[in-house]
């Protein structure tokens, strides 16, 4: 079904709004994936706080203009499935990576984070906020209090020598 100009403008505005507030973006090709599998992917995306939409390439290019995801414009060839992570930068990449393991026809084209194209695998392995805090606490716990005090004292001594 052909879209009229108002529908196209609405789609561009909706995707642009999602892109403006997103932490990261992922573009994928979903040719050959069954409708049932795509429905389950959309459900998982909603649960993970990921905005996901199939958009025509020309509309996708216009939608990302003026956002940090302009770097993805070259990847809009063939059928494009756009996903924007709203809650965690790696959410969309992790979701697509897991989905691609189960569906061989699903292909991740590109991912972007902070205005640059990045590897989707790297983006997918970013720790969540809770995981990062747990890692930090584990590192702090491993260092004994004495080592920490000596390290802080050494830094203080270096700063005092630099001032003198």
Swiss-Prot record:
PROSITE patterns: RIBOSOMAL_L10 (PS01109). One of its GO terms (cellular component) is large ribosomal subunit. The keyword Secreted does not apply. It holds the Pfam family Ribosomal_L10. GO terms for biological process: translation. One of its GO terms (molecular function) is structural constituent of ribosome. NCBIfam families: PRK00099.1-1. Part of the ribosomal stalk of the 50S ribosomal subunit. The N-terminus interacts with L11 and the large rRNA to form the base of the stalk. The C-terminus forms an elongated spine to which L12 dimers bind in a sequential fashion forming a multimeric L10(L12)X complex. This is Large ribosomal subunit protein uL10. It comes from Aliivibrio salmonicida (strain LFI1238). The gene is rplJ.
């Amino acid at each position: 079904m052909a879209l009229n100009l108002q529908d196209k403008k609405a789609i561009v505005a909706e995707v642009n709004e999602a892109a403006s507030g997103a932490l990261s973006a992922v573009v994928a090709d979903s040719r050959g994936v069954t409708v049932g599998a795509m429905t389950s992917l959309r459900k998982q995306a909603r649960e993970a706080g990921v905005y996901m939409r199939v958009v025509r390439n020309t509309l996708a290019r216009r939608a990302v203009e003026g956002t940090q995801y302009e770097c993805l414009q070259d990847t809009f060839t063939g059928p494009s499935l756009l996903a924007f992570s709203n809650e965690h930068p790696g959410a969309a990449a992790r979701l697509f990576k897991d989905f691609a393991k189960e569906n061989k026809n699903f292909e991740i084209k590109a991912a972007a984070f902070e205005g640059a194209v990045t590897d989707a695998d790297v983006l997918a392995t970013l720790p969540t906020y809770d995981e990062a805090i747990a890692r930090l606490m584990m590192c702090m716990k491993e260092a004994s209090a004495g080592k920490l005090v000596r390290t802080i004292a050494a830094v203080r001594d270096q700063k005092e020598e630099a001032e003198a």
